[in-house]
Amino acid sequence: MIKKSAAILAGGKSSRMNYRNKAFLKYEEDYFIERIIKALKDYEEIIIISNNPEEYKEFGLKVFKDIYPSQGPLSGIHSALNHIKNDYCLVVACDMPFINKDVVNYLGNIKEDYEILIPKFQERLQPLCAIYKKSCKDIMEKELINNSNKLIKTCFKFSMKVVEEFPFIEKVHKKEIKNFYNINTVDEYEDLIKKKEI
């Protein structure tokens, strides 16, 4: 058991997905959110951040709303850090159907000498599959109050540990390398269900 919390950001309906809730898109018989919950099962606590908590009752998890709504993923992370019981929280977006248990467990077992532990994949930081220290919430709140809600910009206000290598990644099935891919548009989703490469 990983003594950290995990939070799934399920912000709601996306304009680029014709206002469908991406958490409830299906892939291989499961909703995206079901696939993510399965991948996070070794974390001590799993919560969901959503402004529509009634949609998630079937999962038996605690659901919390944004404290500062309509300010994007930074608001969701801030809310998660205010509600978790542990000192660290893995944050995962609900539109990442390839989240892999081995990857998130590897992140969860890295020594806690950071405020943010953030993977880097294909030369891009991945703040929506990253671990945040609970104490980050105070600076995040100041940013939200000032309507400065750019997530990456805010991340640079903290001590970040960047993870670029996953020693086991070449040993697993090719699809696991897609761990950090997210599905944003109708076309991307249609390609996914047709089993095309993303």
UniProtKB/Swiss-Prot annotation:
* Reactions catalysed according to its record: Mo-molybdopterin + GTP + H(+) = Mo-molybdopterin guanine dinucleotide + diphosphate
The record's Gene Ontology biological-process terms are: Mo-molybdopterin cofactor biosynthetic process
Q: Which family does it belong to?
A: Belongs to the MobA family.
Enumerate the subcellular locations listed in this protein's record, separating them with semicolons. Cytoplasm
Binding-site residues, GTP:
L9, A10, G11, K22, D66, D95
Q: What EC number(s) does its UniProt record assign? A: 2.7.7.77
Q: What is this protein called?
A: Probable molybdenum cofactor guanylyltransferase
> One GO CC term of this entry?
cytoplasm
Pfam families referenced in this protein's UniProt entry, alphabetically: NTP_transf_3
* Residues bound to Mg(2+): D95
Q: Which UniProt keywords apply?
A: Cytoplasm, GTP-binding, Magnesium, Metal-binding, Molybdenum cofactor biosynthesis, Nucleotide-binding, Transferase
Q: Which HAMAP family match?
A: MobA (MF_00316)
Principal EC category: transferase
User: What does the function comment of this entry state?
Assistant: Transfers a GMP moiety from GTP to Mo-molybdopterin (Mo-MPT) cofactor (Moco or molybdenum cofactor) to form Mo-molybdopterin guanine dinucleotide (Mo-MGD) cofactor.
Cofactor(s) it depends on: Mg(2+)
Give the classification, highest ranks. Bacteria, Bacillati, Bacillota, Clostridia, Eubacteriales
State the domain notes: The N-terminal domain determines nucleotide recognition and specific binding, while the C-terminal domain determines the specific binding to the target protein.
Q: What GO annotations for molecular function exist for this entry?
A: GTP binding; metal ion binding; molybdenum cofactor guanylyltransferase activity
Q: Which InterPro entries match?
A: MobA-like_NTP_Trfase, Molybde_CF_guanTrfase, Nucleotide-diphossugar_trans
